[in-house]
Amino acid sequence: MSSVVVVGTQWGDEGKGKITDFLSENAEVIARYQGGNNAGHTIVFNGEKYKLHLIPSGIFYKDKICVIGNGMVVDPKALVAELSYLHEHGISTDNLRISNRAHVILPYHLKLDGLEEERKGANKIGTTKKGIGPAYMDKAARIGIRIVDLLDRDVFAEKLARNLEEKNMLFEKVYGVEGFRHEDIFEEYYEYGQQIAKYVCDTSVVLNNALDEGRRVLFEGAQGVMLDIDQGTYPFVTSSNPVAGGVTIGAGVGPTKIKHVVGVAKAYTTRVGDGPFPTELHDEIGDRIREVGREYGTTTGRPRRVGWFDSVVVRHARRVSGITDLSLNSIDVLTGIETLKICVAYRYRGEVIEEFPASLKVLAECEPIYEELPGWTEDITGVRSLDELPANARHYVERISQLTGIPLSIFSVGPDRSQTNVVRSVYA
């Protein structure tokens, strides 16, 4: 049995899609365990770029099973569109499996997401407005509609009617807007359910059988540890658990079956949306990193906020996710910057803090303590091993590994999968 979990160690957008795609080559099953179509990943396959939001990136390999786990929230309309997009490009989806226990995002979730964000005004979270939060709210309130319900015409009709009664009262009395009629949603979404029915099963059985048979299973996290609802910068977080522990709940696989946890980080830090960001840059260097690194959201197109690498953040991610391997991406983006900085700790009211604080009030007053390192000017995009890196680039990479306490297993010097280099196998 060999299982690997891929998690983001920062605020998402660390390049997990590319690393998952790279590791998928040696995996037999690839599964997502949380989130929904709020997560976007770009995959380059046969020289062509694909953008996926729901379906695991292993779908491009005909011999691999791809799983949408029970911990995900699925927008059936978005899923059917993504399936069509893949079919139009000649990509088979026969090996897709969708959990019958995953929850469904419906039009009222999308509407609520947008209205609630507007209502918050200056206190908005920076949601992608994909209905993720409201769908997880219904799940926690035990009124959610699951995939298994969507496939049963009578059950779906009854649950939808009950939910619309409550949601329409909310729309009309609280937000002062028109609600939905049953017929606005029912037939369209029931039909989406029928279109995906052939993929639906108990995915926990699929995954556990694969592990028991000794197959290599790769679990693909979305977002990042700092967006985890428990361990992230709450409330500026997602509504699920991207941490590695989320696999046990969101995929139905016991904790004893997780062997390796790969933490993916950029050689700098980015964040989309609102919330604290201690090492954020508001200068020419920040603008340069954003442009060279093409730091714009896959899902939203929004420019990402950019900052120096923060080892306090990644150490926190290591601890709460049990990270065993570091995958460091986008090292090439820093080429040409004369002096690089790594945050090693925070200073709060004269005191040095080495662990990430829970209080956003404290965090807002924290000043990053930086270690400066010399940059490099050499082109590193063709580098294939640590030994080939210029001395300063290698020192920078190794210093990040030292400061975070995570052994380096993979490093990347460009967006293409051929620019991804293995230092040690994560399947060992």
UniProtKB/Swiss-Prot annotation:
Subcellular localization(s) per the UniProt record: Cytoplasm
Keyword Magnesium: yes
Keyword check for Ligase: yes
Sites where the protein binds IMP: 13-16, 38-41, 128, 142, 223, 238, 302
Annotated cofactor note: Binds 1 Mg(2+) ion per subunit.
MF GO annotations: adenylosuccinate synthase activity; GTP binding; magnesium ion binding
This protein's name: Adenylosuccinate synthetase
Organism: Geobacillus thermodenitrificans (strain NG80-2)
